[in-house]
Swiss-Prot record:
This is Gamma-crystallin C. SUPFAM superfamilies: gamma-Crystallin-like. Changing residue 5 to P: In CTRCT2; reduces protein-protein interactions in vivo. It is linked to Cataract 2, multiple types: An opacification of the crystalline lens of the eye that frequently results in visual impairment or blindness. Opacities vary in morphology, are often confined to a portion of the lens, and may be static or progressive. CTRCT2 includes Coppock-like cataract, among others. Coppock-like cataract is a congenital pulverulent disk-like opacity involving the embryonic nucleus with many tiny white dots in the lamellar portion of the lens. It is usually bilateral and dominantly inherited. The modification S-methylcysteine is found at residue 23. It comes from the Eukaryota. Has a two-domain beta-structure, folded into four very similar Greek key motifs. Coiled coil: none annotated. It comes from Homo sapiens (Human). The gene is CRYGC.
Amino acid sequence: MGKITFYEDRAFQGRSYETTTDCPNLQPYFSRCNSIRVESGCWMLYERPNYQGQQYLLRRGEYPDYQQWMGLSDSIRSCCLIPQTVSHRLRLYEREDHKGLMMELSEDCPSIQDRFHLSEIRSLHVLEGCWVLYELPNYRGRQYLLRPQEYRRCQDWGAMDAKAGSLRRVVDLY
């Protein structure tokens, strides 16, 4: 089970809201979010209600201001607890509809370019576990939560283009 607390002000000040479950709409509980404490679990935060907009992966720890989770603003409007699994495995494809060169991963990959000599991934198949795809190397830039399923084109995971820099398994490290 996970537990996360949102605070309206920096350094864990101001009005707060605590949850242990997915929340499709956080707007009734706070108007802005400037700090977060994750007591347990891994959470994906979204800048808009109903799991839309920019995504931010947070693991157990303290985030005294929104820059600590690479936030672009103090807007957090929905969140979901990411289920934990023991094993992780996914397949990357250079073309849409799972065509072209296929590569398989079971560990974090800080640079897709260095490892596979690709800067774009056109389709994916997540076989086990949840992953986060980052648009830039070293786990930077826009983030996309990938659950076990087939993604036939980049729009299926919410991206506007196929730019892919790094991949990380969602694992609660504690």
